[in-house]
């Protein structure tokens, strides 16, 4: 059975998109899933840095090999984090990032689905051709928003586009742990503003004060037993979200 592509996206930077991608990877890892994280935040990718991965290959090198008939195996371009999680890193050089063409994205995802149970794609917050292609080829897209008026207004615009194009394969997560001082809008107000439901909420209690320590150590939060115990409610919520994102029910719903 082919793996499922789950893209993680937003309409504003700094909303916790990369951390959420890594947390999902940790949950799938604990479930025994083989996971590939593809960093397609091409100009500001943070996956390899967050995991302390010293990658020698990246997605640009893979695409360059494809374009010049040198490509043979996806594994030649991924870097292993642990026994269940591999990473296809973003380019280190922004000049190379500019050369990544959207037409190669479906090919990369097809190769990845053959090798992995779950393919997590960390995107940028810019709705460009590459991100639109990723969403088109995703089994599900997780959209992340915060209690921020600019963020919510932009999310409203994206949701409107999805509805106009009859796109249904997405869930929306409200991340209250990112800016704990922002509580301007109630959940009802947020739903009204974006014109859609909030499927999952990460509470402000999940704010990790010493998160820099975990980043320095290259840790995934959901693989840390102490964090999982102390923040059990939010972790359980993320586990439910992770299972929902790969649930076969979306096929039955025409997603």
Task: Give the positions of each predicted feature.
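Walker A (P-loop) phosphate-binding motif
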Residues: 1-35
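Acidic-aromatic/histidine active-site loop/patch
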Residues: 1-5, 160-165, 169-170, 215, ...
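Phosphate-binding loop that captures ATP/GTP phosphates
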Residues: 28-87
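Cytosolic-facing regulatory segments adjacent to core modules
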Residues: 66-130
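Inter-motif core of Ras-like GTPase G domains
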Residues: 111, 126-148
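Well-ordered beta-strand positions
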Residues: 118, 140, 196-200
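C-terminal structural cap/anchor segments
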Residues: 138-192
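Beta-strand-loop-alpha "switch" segments that mediate conformational coupling across diverse proteins
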Residues: 178, 190-222
């Amino acid at each position: 059975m082919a793996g499922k592509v789950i893209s993680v996206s937003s309409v504003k930077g700094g909303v916790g998109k990369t951390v959420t991608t890594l947390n999902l990877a940790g949950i799938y890892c604990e479930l025994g899933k083989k996971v590939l994280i593809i960093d397609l935040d091409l100009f500001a990718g943070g996956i390899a840095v967050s995991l302390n991965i010293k990658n020698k290959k990246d997605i640009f090198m893979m695409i360059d090999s494809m374009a010049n008939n040198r490509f043979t195996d996806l594994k030649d371009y991924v870097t292993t984090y642990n026994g269940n999680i591999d990473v296809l890193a973003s380019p280190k050089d922004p000049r190379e990032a500019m050369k990544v063409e959207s037409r190669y994205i479906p090919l990369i995802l097809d190769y990845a689905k053959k090798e992995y149970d779950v393919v997590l794609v960390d995107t940028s917050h810019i709705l460009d051709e590459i991100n639109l292609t990723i969403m088109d080829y995703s089994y599900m897209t997780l959209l992340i928003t915060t209690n921020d008026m600019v963020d919510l207004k932009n999310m409203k615009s994206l949701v409107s586009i999805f509805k106009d194009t009859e796109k249904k394969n997405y869930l929306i997560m409200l991340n209250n742990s990112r800016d704990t001082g922002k509580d301007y809008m109630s959940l009802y107000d947020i739903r009204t503003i974006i014109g859609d439901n909030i499927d999952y909420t990460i509470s402000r209690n999940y704010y990790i004060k010493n998160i820099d320590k975990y980043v320095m150590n290259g840790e995934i939060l959901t693989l840390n037993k102490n964090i999982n115990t102390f923040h059990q409610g939010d972790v359980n919520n993320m586990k439910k979200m992770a299972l929902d994102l790969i649930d076969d029910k979306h096929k039955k719903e025409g997603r």
